[in-house]
A protein has these predicted regions:
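Structured loop/turn residues at beta-strand edges in well-structured enzyme cores
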Residues: 18, 60, 106, 168, ...
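His/Asp/Glu-enriched, well-ordered alpha-helical/loop segment
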Residues: 128-146, 150, 162-174, 179-269
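Conserved protein kinase catalytic core
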Residues: 30-33, 119, 181, 287
Length: 296
């Protein structure tokens, strides 16, 4: 993955392609009970020290790392990641409220795909104990990733997230796999050689059981449509959740807003909120014509 990012950046036509800012790695230091569609055989413990090899191989390409903050030995990984400038996000976690509270005090700034693959309220001796989900909603300073593809979360939960986190505390993500934007069919989740076959109907990817989700097939413009049309979020707020908010979460000041001196990387949406043109550094590199898509 890291090599692919580097190759993409160094390609002869890289200046006309989407800008790759780095990689977001989910795992392998996650809770097996919250693995989602991930293959359990690849889950590791941070106690084995293998995270050092991952950081070395990343060579600066790793920007966000999703880990489960309750794991034994996670503190050493956290320290190593911070030293490399990697942002930590809590996810695929079966931890308690206190685990995310500790994580937030130790440099975590994000929570990965809110509601998906994370613990929630349990009963212990009759008492209710909040989990990672409740901590993510309550704790200030944690930006929440939200898969607003119209499938993972219903409009009611999208509205609840906006009400609790506020428009500035949300980053919309596709959580897409390689079937994104493609026709319905069978696609590989993970490695092309060793990955899992999953089934896309054009709206969502599912595991072979036909029930469990295996990632999204949405493109980012769908997120904006879902938030505005189904969740009732004002357009300017939905746009902010896919532009300025993620830029701020990554600590990037040169993108995410239209302002003199910033990079003129733009996506133009039509009245139907579908993409009709793409600009990079102020130059149009793609547009949708009446006869179909074309690069310029």
């Amino acid at each position: 993955m890291f090599d692919l990012c580097r190759q993409f950046r160094q390609a002869p036509d890289a200046g006309t392609r989407p800008r790759i800012l780095g990689a977001h790695l989910e795992g392998p230091y996650i809770a097996a009970s919250m693995k989602g569609a991930q293959d359990e055989k690849y889950i590791r413990s941070p106690e084995d020290g293998s995270y050092r090899d991952i950081l070395k191989r990343a060579g600066g390409m790793l920007r966000i790392w999703t880990v489960a903050p309750e794991l034994l030995g996670i503190e050493a990984l956290e320290k190593a990641a911070r030293s490399e400038g990697v942002l930590l996000s809590a996810g695929h976690s079966d931890g308690r409220f206190e685990d995310l509270e500790r994580a937030a005090q130790n440099g975590y700034t994000m929570v990965t795909h809110l509601y998906s693959s994370m613990s929630t309220i349990i009963r212990e001796n009759g008492m209710r104990r909040p989990g990672i989900l409740e901590a993510a909603l309550l704790l200030d300073g944690l930006t929440a990733e939200v898969i607003a593809d119209g499938m993972h979360l219903p409009p009611s939960l999208l509205r609840l997230i906006v009400k609790t986190k506020g428009a500035d505390g949300i980053v919309l993500v596709t959580d897409a796999m390689r079937g994104a934007g493609m026709p319905a069919g069978i696609y590989k989740l993970g490695s092309l050689r060793r990955g899992q076959d999953v089934i896309s109907d054009g709206q969502i990817a599912r595991m072979p059981d036909g029930i469990s989700f295996a990632g999204s097939v949405a493109t980012t413009d769908r997120l904006v449509r879902v938030m505005t049309r189904e969740a009732g979020v004002p357009l300017w707020q939905a746009v902010r959740m896919v532009t300025l908010n993620p830029a701020r979460a990554l600590g990037l000041e040169e993108i995410g807003v239209l302002q003199a001196g910033r990079r003129a990387d733009l996506v133009v949406l039509g009245p139907d909120l579908h993409v009709c043109a793409v600009y990079r550094d102020g130059r149009r590199v793609w547009e949708k014509s009446g006869k179909g898509d074309r690069e310029t």
